[in-house]
Amino acid sequence: MRICNLLNRNRIKHWITQIFALALLVAATSAQDGQPPVAAPVRPPLPPLPAPMALPKPGPTNDAPYVPQPILPGGVVVPLYPPGSPLLKMERIREAEQYNMSQAVPGRISSIVNIHNPSIEVHTVDGGLNTGAAIILAAGGGHNTLNVGGESADFVPFFYNYGVNTIILRNRLRRDGYSPKIDAVNDALQAIRLVRAYAREWRIDPNKIGIMGFSAGAELSSPAAILFDEFDRTNSAPADPLSGVSSRPDFVGIIYPGPTPFVRGASPPIPRNAPPAFITCAGAGDRVHAIWANEYFAAMLQAGIPNVEMHIYGNGRHPGDTLSDGSRMTSGLTDRNAIPFGTWQYRFIDWFRDLGFLQKPGIETKASKEITAFLSQPPPGSGRGGGGNRGATNSQANPVGAAPKAATPANP
């Protein structure tokens, strides 16, 4: 024990000696330079940061119907219905939308509620890049909010890179007293008609207009694929400025969908010119939405509709789900920690390019040609073959590849 204590004392003395020697060396060096030891400089404080600029905000309210403001710079906002439309609630038309802003990113609108004057916000592409294709984005949110941040606004620059024009749909919500199956679906179909009516002004190919819905938004895009005839017949009054303009989408995107028209074995009639569809969802981690996705796919496959593609990923969760660490699953374009489900948007681009939607405007797409070929086949039950198309009807409100009837644009 005595030996250990002696060794420890010797070590301490050695360290003290070394420190003292180093201090003498520093002092000697400073004396040789004729300068006192230099202290660390004291910097002045940084100037305060400026406040964020050009933050989006709801439009003013007055005696006129509320006019929505753009979510992103440069957006052209057009109300879906003219003032006085019977499809609007006149007692609420003047109410302002309410924005839920991101707490971390200044100016980022995460979601919107209190939508009573539904609208589209159009973002076009420069002429040299423009393919003429246009995608209407229907965000999710459980019909309680409209998650326009991750499931609409983020896609504008993404699709711009591929020459695709982007339209953000602000549809009405169940939380504000509207029916998702009636009012919101009407908003989606009206949006398709409105974009088609203004196609020339926005340099959009009228035969390359589709809709992509996310979660609750897919409860708009999936019925839009089969209900366009009924909507056009119902809204064909001569006084309607969009009468004669087809609401048929040229393609649909069904992304981690809510219930489709084929939920629990339902079998509504499927028009034989139903559009091609791209469907994606996580699998076991989002089982119920994957089942709904598969119901839509199976119905279209049974009907023989061309170019319906589905990707069900083994790993992934539904956007908004709470994880074990307390974080929430993100939506839209996020790469989801580099799992394959985080690349679904590139699989959509592969499908979209394969069907000819990324060609220059005015060139008939492969999708259109293959639907035309399908329509030339005998319908099911005709006694001339063509079996396996259970549920398909002969509806052709807007023959594929034909330009829609011209209409006087609405006066928003």
Language-model features and meaning:
Residues 131-140:
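Short beta-strand element of the alpha/beta-hydrolase
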Residues 286-295:
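Conserved alpha/beta-hydrolase "acid-adjacent" motif
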Residues 279-281:
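Short beta-strand/loop motif that positions the catalytic acidic residue
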Residues 147-148, 154-155, 169-203, 337-340:
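Catalytic nucleophile-loop/oxyanion-hole region of alpha/beta-hydrolase
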Residues 301-412:
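C-terminal catalytic histidine-bearing segment of alpha/beta-hydrolase fold enzymes
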Residues 124, 148-167, 297-298:
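Short amphipathic alpha-helix adjacent to the substrate-entry channel of hydrolases
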Residues 186-273, 370-371:
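Primarily recognizes the serine-hydrolase "nucleophile elbow" in alpha/beta-hydrolase
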Residues 44, 50-130:
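N-terminal cap/lid segment of alpha/beta-hydrolase-fold proteins
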